[in-house]
Regions:
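Short glycine-rich or small-residue beta-strand-to-loop segments that form or flank ligand, phosphate
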Residues: 57, 84-86, 164-167, 384-389
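N-terminal glycine-rich, Lys/His-bearing helix-loop that initiates the first secondary-structure elements
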Residues: 1-44, 456, 460, 492-493, ...
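Conserved N-terminal alpha-helix of the aminotransferase class I/II PLP-enzyme fold
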Residues: 46-89
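Conserved PLP-enzyme active-site core in the AAT-like
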Residues: 7-12, 16-20, 80, 90-322, ...
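Short, compositionally biased
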Residues: 126, 131, 484-495
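Conserved C-terminal alpha-helix-loop-beta "cap" of PLP-dependent enzymes
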Residues: 310-491
Length: 502
């Protein structure tokens, strides 16, 4: 795509492209679905719907009528005590949940793979972090679940912590056992916050299974949705996999111990005082569509995913990571992929594919698919993450499969197999207080400095060093080795600078 002179020019050109979206947002620009459900006017005349809090429009931070109804409808749909609408994304929800549950200067136990918003909350609240290392899939080098054992050890060592933050599913779809983690956190009197930004759809997969059972079908199913597994607060990015617009999300309060007013108060401080009615309207529409047509949408989504996985295993040189294993290379094996270590398995809506056997890196595979009009979400090592959503249709999967077959035929198995960069044993940095201000310094000169921004490697997508941890020569050497091997590192800029506390 040619460079554009403005955002509008880019958006116009992008909209005109004949491409298939396997990236966020989840609606996939499927205008027809909005139109079929009676909402074409919002898309056709958006400028007239862009208003502020005029009389009759209600007020987000003091909802009494229409916005209160949307909140109540979501609470009923997800089966929770209360729902807050988010117009600053799940980021605002994560920060609000942490600040509402952890007092200033308090302690939070959190996964090292937490969203950047969690690190912002640490600074805002002067909160002391206790980091838990996620498991790593040794074969595929993907960040996996937070184990109940790891949480138990952290709780034992830090009984004064107020809350626990877990990300599940993670970016690549790997999930933690929220039921066990909830039990562990509650045993120590701690609230469990779940960043379920990538799993807003999971509750509807539950409903679909329940409906099928009511019709007499045998549907083995264990719930994945944190709302049903005892979590106290769950943050969902409805725009990532469902049908609302980018930037809109919801925060679900489930546990009786959570002070709803405390969460609402923090959100009033964090979010804009001019909330977008377009975003809130899209949240309203998303709730209505999923309530009225959710079962139909989820059934088609599941059917299409099953179709894709069964066809994908027949393509020579293609590996599809699903659970703790991968099948492919033309095996034709349709025994759908073994479960991950965690008994409930991964989120099947996240498709991680590799053609390393044909000599393609993740970047090269992404480029080849983009050339064929298939746009993925993220490259991580030899893998490409394809994010499916409620807006994808069977034709999208057909085009993806056709493109993968073409790539397989073009490269053939005679090419030299792609060898991913070597992995090195990650050192464990010492902890300090999280700094509240920072400065840029060269990586090589950061020995003894306290990190301000996380330094993250992809894969597996977990920080090497988190905010509040101390840089050492061992850590610096480890990061330099990763960079020399061509690994993707976030937190080190093109000039080799990192941000540390002052």
């Amino acid at each position: 795509m040619e460079k554009s002179k403005s955002i509008y020019d880019f958006l116009k050109k992008n909209a005109a492209e004949d491409h298939i979206s396997f990236h966020m947002p989840g609606h996939k620009a499927r205008r027809q679905l909005y139109a079929e459900c009676g909402y074409a006017d919002l898309l056709n005349d958006a400028i007239r719907y862009d208003i502020t809090e005029i009389p009759g429009a209600d007020a987000l931070y003091h909802p009494k009528t229409t916005l209160r109804a949307v909140m109540d409808n979501y609470a009923e749909l997800y089966g929770v005590r209360h729902t807050e609408l988010l117009v600053n994304g799940a980021s605002a929800g994560i920060i609000a949940a942490i600040l509402a549950c952890v007092p200033v200067g308090g302690k939070l136990i959190l996964g090292r793979n937490s969203h950047h918003a969690a690190f912002s909350a640490l600074r805002l609240g002067g909160i002391n972090p206790v980091y838990i290392q996620p498991e790593t899939d040794a074969k595929y080098n993907l960040a996996a679940e937070i184990s109940a054992y790891a949480l138990e050890e952290a709780c034992k060592a830090n009984p004064d912590a107020s809350a626990v933050l877990i990300t599940s599913p993670n970016y690549c779809g790997m999930m933690s056992d929220i039921s066990l983690l909830t039990e562990t956190a509650h045993d120590y009197g701690m609230a469990l916050i779940v960043d379920q930004a990538h799993g807003a759809h999971l509750r509807f997969f539950d409903y679909d299974a329940k409906a099928a059972r009511e019709e007499g079908a045998f549907v083995p199913h264990i719930s994945h949705a944190a709302e049903t597994l005892g979590a106290d607060i769950v943050i969902n990015s409805t725009h990532k996999t469902l049908l609302s617009f980018t930037g809109s999300s919801i925060l679900n309060i489930c546990g009786d111990s959570i002070d709803i007013n405390a969460v609402s108060d923090v959100l009033r401080m964090l979010q804009t005082t001019s909330p977008s009615y377009l975003l809130m309207a899209s949240l309203d529409i998303n709730e209505k569509i999923m309530r009225e047509r959710g079962r139909e949408i989820i059934k088609s989504w599941k059917t299409d995913l099953d179709y894709f996985y069964k066809e994908a295993v027949k393509i020579s040189g293609l590996s599809v990571v699903q659970g703790g294993g991968a099948k492919g290379s033309g095996s034709g094996d349709e025994e759908c992929f073994p479960l991950y270590r965690y008994r409930e398995g991964p989120d099947v809506t996240k498709i991680n594919i590799s053609m390393a056997e044909l000599g393609l890196s993740g970047e090269r595979l992404e480029h080849e698919l983009r050339y064929k009009g298939i746009i993925g979400e993220m490259v991580h090592g030899e893998y490409l993450l394809l994010m499916t959503g409620a807006g994808n249709v069977r034709g999208d999967y057909d085009r993806l499969l056709a493109a993968l077959r073409d790539i397989s035929a073009s490269y053939g198995i005679s090419h030299t197999e792609y060898r991913p960069p070597r992995s090195f044993e990650a050192p464990r940095p010492e902890a300090s207080d999280v700094p509240t201000s920072g400065e840029l310094v060269p990586l090589y000169a950061s020995d003894g400095r306290v990190l301000y921004d996380p330094i993250i490697t992809y894969p597996p997508g977990t920080p090497i060093v988190c905010p509040g941890e101390i840089m050492s020569m061992e850590v610096i050497g480890y990061i330099q080795n990763l960079l020399s091997e061509g690994n993707r590192i976030s937190g080190v800029d093109e000039e080799g600078m990192i941000k540390v506390g002052v």
